[in-house]
Amino acid sequence: MVTANLRFVVKVAYEYRSYGIKMSDLIQEGNIGLMKAVQKFDPDKGIRLISYAVWWIRAYIQNYILKSWSLVKLGTTQAHGKLFFSLARTRRELEKFGSGDAAVNVDDIARRLHVKPGEVREMEQRMGGRDLSLDAPMGEDGGNSHVDFVVSAAAPQDDEFADKEEAGLINARVRAALMRLDPREPFIIEQRVMNERPMTLKELGEHFGFSRERARQLEIRAKDKLKSELAALMAEVDPEAVAAQQ
């Protein structure tokens, strides 16, 4: 199963080519994520392998990028990771609808990404300024530096890519976590949360043959377990980052 999906790993890795990391390294990390997914994959859950594996592939690649950029202290928590990959897009969204006050925008960005305003300012300086670590040559040939590969804030196509990237990653994470739940719990989550036309508690109870109140209790339990499994997935990919958040 690993060999059959190697080309997909290359495709995903190519999406991260702008971060100044060798493609061979990105592909290698993606392959590790794929192997992890294959080890944990359960075909009886009714989810396609590639839908499950994409979360692991992206998670390992993103984690590697963050660690590669750690020489400029970008941060290792999940919130810092989101800040790194979403800062430029989030700022443009807020400036588009705001007053143009940079201080207000920084506070808004910090609230949206669950970090401190000072962390936003520091990240912007490190990603967009002339930081010595970013300007250092990446290879022995003294050619490109890390800053040369940072996504340009002026590129409009990056907005669409970032939106799809974040939505796809969230969906893949949820799908991966759903596979860890008891057999009927994924159905409850999908029917009550993920469907465009959610089942009512009464309909859910009738489907399984129990009361509306019992359906409500099972929904709460399924949601709590899903949150726990999502946290566990993050810990498996990068336990240091999860520990830093606690």
Curated annotation (Swiss-Prot):
Presence of the UniProt keyword Amino-acid biosynthesis in the record: no
Gene3D superfamilies: 1.20.140.160, RNA Polymerase Primary Sigma Factor
Gene Ontology terms, MF aspect: DNA binding; sigma factor activity
Xref: SUPFAM superfamilies: Sigma2 domain of RNA polymerase sigma factors, Sigma3 and sigma4 domains of RNA polymerase sigma factors
Pfam families per record: Sigma70_r2, Sigma70_r4
Motif mapping: Polymerase core binding: 25-38
Residues annotated to bind DNA: 201-220
Superkingdom as given in the UniProt entry: Bacteria
Gene Ontology annotations of biological process type: DNA-templated transcription initiation
Keyword list, A-Z: DNA-binding, Sigma factor, Transcription, Transcription regulation
Protein family membership: Belongs to the sigma-70 factor family.
Function: Sigma factors are initiation factors that promote the attachment of RNA polymerase to specific initiation sites and are then released. This sigma factor is essential for late-stage differentiation of M.xanthus.
Descriptive protein name: RNA polymerase sigma-B factor
Upper lineage: Bacteria, Pseudomonadati, Myxococcota, Myxococcia, Myxococcales
Gene: sigB
